Structure formats: structure tokens, C-alpha cells
Amino acid sequence: MELVLKDAQSALEVSEATFGREFNEALVHQVVVAFGAGARQGSKAQKTRSEVRGGGAKPWRQKGTGRARAGTIRSPIWRSGGVTFAAKPQDHSQKVNKKMYRGAIQSILSELVRQERLIVVEKFSVEAPKTKELLSKLNGLELSDVLIVTSEVDENLFLAARNLYKVDVRDVQGIDPVSLIAFEKVLITADAVKALEEALA
């Protein structure tokens, strides 16, 4: 299959397996959920009644005071007491094998092509790290909410986009399923398309 280059009167021959695959919603959902789960810090920690400082002595005798019986001031029903089911640090990451991950990325790329949200250009760069220059180029392509994918990290492009809302710059190694679906359009260079094909082959 072919992808038309926006800035040139030509087309790029690409793999049907990478850019013409049927959309697998269940697979994409699973991989996106796993990606989000892996990003969780998982460091929340609370103390149980046995871990809270103090509470060794019985606050008052068992009988005769008229008050409810109590054995420790660190009971979960007391103020400053321990937490009944205390949260502990945990790993939220989910296992996703390489074949599934590649399949999800291919599925997303294919759907972007079908929805005409993937824009391919021969080259895309800025002379200097100037936001105004990048904004001018994006306006020329009628793009505002866009992920820019290049084959290698372009420092000028990265710095120019850093202060723009709904604009992000990634190299091929830096893309992930969430970033691909988070933006309205994906602008990708021809070199990045070839690099993606090799990575997903």
C-alpha cells in the first residue's frame, strides 16, 4: 500500500501489515490499560495498628469506669490509630508480550491511516529552537493538536514544541500507544515511517 506525502507530489510504499491491519479494539484496550498501569507509582503506604508508634499500655482498666473497654490507643477506631486495611507499596505493572505490543501499535497506526489522521511528510524541522517558527509551520499544514514523530531526536524541534499546548515531539523509540491515540493528528516523517516498519516487522 502507499501513503501520500503531504509536502511532495509522491507516495511512500509501506507494509500492509503495519499500516493496513484490521483494527483490534480488545488488544489496543489491553495494551493501553497495561501501559497506564505500568506508569503508576505504587508507593502509597499506611500503617496498621501494629506499626503505629505507641499504644503499648492499656488506656484504662477493663471494668468499673463506665467507659467502653479498650486495650490500646492505636485501635483503628481511635483517632491517631492504625488503618484497618492499610495500603502497602505494590507493583501495578501488567505483562504484555512483544507480539501483543507490536500488534497494538500496528492496529493504531492502521486506524490512523483509515481515519486520515496520519500525515506523512518528507522532512520536518526548524532552523532554530523558536516556538513561533514551529507554530508557523504547523499552521501552514493546518495542524494544532498534533504528535510529531521523527526518526531521531531533533533538539531544535523539541525545544520549539516544549511550550506549545497539545503539541508533542517524539522519536520512533519514544512513541507509545497512549501518545498515538491522545492527539487529533500524527505528523510523521518518511524516515520515521521506515524506521517504524523495521521496528514492528
From Swiss-Prot:
Domain of life according to the entry: Bacteria
A Gene Ontology cellular-component term: ribonucleoprotein complex
Gene Ontology molecular-function annotations: rRNA binding; structural constituent of ribosome
Keyword annotations from UniProtKB, A to Z: Ribonucleoprotein, Ribosomal protein, RNA-binding, rRNA-binding
Gene3D superfamilies xrefs: 3.40.1370.10
Residue span of region Disordered: 43-66
InterPro entries listed in its UniProt record: Ribosomal_uL4 (IPR002136), Ribosomal_uL4-like (IPR013005), Ribosomal_uL4_dom_sf (IPR023574)
One GO term of the biological process aspect: translation
Job description of the protein: One of the primary rRNA binding proteins, this protein initially binds near the 5'-end of the 23S rRNA. It is important during the early stages of 50S assembly. It makes multiple contacts with different domains of the 23S rRNA in the assembled 50S subunit and ribosome. Forms part of the polypeptide exit tunnel.
PANTHER family named in the record: 50S RIBOSOMAL PROTEIN L4, LARGE RIBOSOMAL SUBUNIT PROTEIN UL4M
Subunit-structure text: Part of the 50S ribosomal subunit.
NCBIfam families from the UniProt entry: rplD_bact (TIGR03953)
Family: Belongs to the universal ribosomal protein uL4 family.
Protein name: Large ribosomal subunit protein uL4
Organism encoding this protein: Pseudoalteromonas atlantica (strain T6c / ATCC BAA-1087)
Gene: rplD
